[in-house]
């Protein structure tokens, strides 16, 4: 597609020679420039401020006697002429007219800093052919902001990808430690209740006189171990790490099992003796 456009433009360039008597005006809103018969190097400028603007081209050439074989108006980027769009004006006798709505300009051209409007006239039966830069069109920042153009990514170095991995949860749902705390307190109360049920409230404190000091130490150590478990779960509920909680739980389980077995054996022995 691009190749065919370049070939057509090249053919027009080969044919284009003169048409120096081109006169008329180009207007955008209330701003207007005029073209004289002399083709000077100076190219005037007009500004597009809104998508509602219209580029009005009204030209006249004495050498044109009807529509030429080839006539085209192009709007292209000054820095990169390959980015362009083309229009066919209306030719009636020696008059050339064309209205270009700013809204119809390609999105990519709306983003450019400076555009150039050029007319090409060529006819194989005439020696007076022409290529002429008519005016430079400057898209305003407000007009640029209306463009929906997005540049396509090119092959090459791409921006570095940054990804923040989500950290593991430091604690579980608060309801879990609450359930463990309630269960631990329930078991502790059940332990005391079983002692009262088996031994009786009157004989509970009397057993301190019948058991040895070593067994009393084991009983107290067992109670301290159970309270340690309670404290460990409370600290976990207040924000202690799960790994720290498991570590302390493992440490407390050793004396708890050891002294718990001793307490149960002592209770079984005393019950067998009827104490």
Swiss-Prot record:
GO terms for biological process: protein glycosylation. Residues 1-18 form the signal peptide. The keyword Heme does not apply. It is a multi-pass membrane protein. Its main location: endoplasmic reticulum. Pathway: Protein modification; protein glycosylation. This is Dolichyl-diphosphooligosaccharide--protein glycosyltransferase subunit delta. It comes from Candida albicans (strain SC5314 / ATCC MYA-2876).
């Amino acid at each position: 597609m691009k190749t065919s456009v370049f070939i057509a433009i090249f053919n027009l360039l080969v044919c284009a020679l003169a048409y120096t008597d081109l006169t008329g005006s180009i207007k955008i809103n209330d701003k207007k420039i005029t073209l004289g018969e002399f083709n000077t190097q100076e190219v005037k400028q007009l500004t597009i401020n809104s998508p509602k603007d219209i580029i009005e081209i009204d030209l006249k050439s004495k050498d044109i006697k009807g529509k030429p074989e080839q006539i085209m108006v192009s709007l292209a980027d000054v820095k990169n002429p390959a980015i362009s769009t083309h229009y066919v004006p209306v030719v009636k006798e020696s008059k050339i007219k064309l209205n270009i709505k700013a809204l119809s300009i390609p999105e990519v051209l709306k983003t450019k800093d400076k555009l150039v409007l050029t007319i090409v006239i060529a006819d194989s039966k005439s020696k007076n052919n022409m290529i002429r830069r008519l005016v430079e069109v400057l898209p305003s920042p407000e007009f640029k902001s209306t463009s929906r153009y997005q540049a396509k990514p090119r092959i090459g170095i791409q921006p570095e990808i940054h990804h923040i991995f989500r950290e593991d949860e430091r604690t579980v749902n608060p309801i879990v430690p609450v359930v463990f705390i309630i269960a631990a307190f329930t078991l502790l109360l059940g332990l005391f209740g079983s002692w009262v049920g088996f031994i009786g409230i009157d004989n509970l404190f009397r057993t301190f006189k019948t058991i040895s000091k070593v067994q009393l130490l084991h009983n107290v150590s067992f109670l301290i171990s159970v309270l340690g478990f309670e404290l460990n779960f409370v600290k976990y509920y207040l924000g202690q790490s799960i790994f720290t909680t498991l570590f302390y739980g493992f440490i407390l389980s050793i004396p708890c099992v050891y002294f718990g077995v001793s307490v149960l054996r002592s209770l079984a022995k005393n019950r067998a003796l009827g104490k």
